[in-house]
């Protein structure tokens, strides 16, 4: 990490940090993965499977890798806390894994209708992902808020992905996706 800015507000010095390069960003996210999941042995396998699935637009493999990933997080990570009840936990695990791949991802991607939980931008495709804990239809939120319209002029395949988690199961219970038809372009 490098110091981006020093702020002196009379009470204390504050430091704004930045990641100097892609290698440091990947290494830092690997540390987050280790902290959030205790999966140091399987981490590379999960990273490779996620990357392969995304580059091949294979959302069934993406789903099965995520299910296996969450199944392998030790139960004691959930003991004496209620972390499994929060969308932020699940999205943070997925974010850390995807960020460790060195691909472009945007958390809380702002649109004119709200925020996309996670956008993945690859050379050939864009994935718009919404996470929910419980039964609310994540995919329908993406569709109803027309989040894909932000990327229609990018000339890439666009995939909408809704992922639901169950706090008792501590895993994915619903995974729906849809490819946006590229018949309409915004001017």
Describe each PLM feature range.
Residues 165-169:
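Short, internal active-site loops enriched in acidic
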Residues 148-151:
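Short catalytic/binding micro-motifs of nucleotide second-messenger systems
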Residues 153-155:
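Conserved RecA-like P-loop NTPase helicase motor core
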């Amino acid at each position: 990490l490098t110091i981006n800015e020093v702020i002196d507000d009379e009470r204390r010095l504050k430091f704004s940090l930045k990641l100097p390069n892609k290698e440091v960003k990947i290494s830092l996210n690997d540390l987050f993965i280790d902290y959030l999941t205790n999966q140091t042995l399987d981490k590379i396998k999960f990273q490779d499977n996620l990357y392969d699935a995304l580059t091949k637009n294979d959302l069934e493999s993406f789903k099965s890798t995520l299910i296996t990933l969450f199944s392998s997080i030790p139960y004691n990570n959930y003991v004496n806390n209620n972390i499994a009840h929060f969308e932020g936990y699940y999205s943070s695990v997925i974010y850390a894994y995807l960020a460790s791949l060195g691909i472009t991802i945007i958390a809380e991607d702002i649109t004119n209708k709200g925020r996309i939980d996670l956008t993945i931008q690859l050379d050939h495709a864009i994935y718009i992902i919404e996470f929910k804990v419980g039964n609310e239809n994540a995919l329908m939120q993406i569709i109803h808020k027309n989040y894909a319209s932000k990327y229609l002029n990018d000339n890439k395949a666009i995939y909408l992905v809704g992922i639901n988690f169950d706090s008792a199961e501590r895993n994915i219970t619903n995974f729906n996706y849809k490819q946006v038809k590229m018949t309409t372009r915004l001017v």
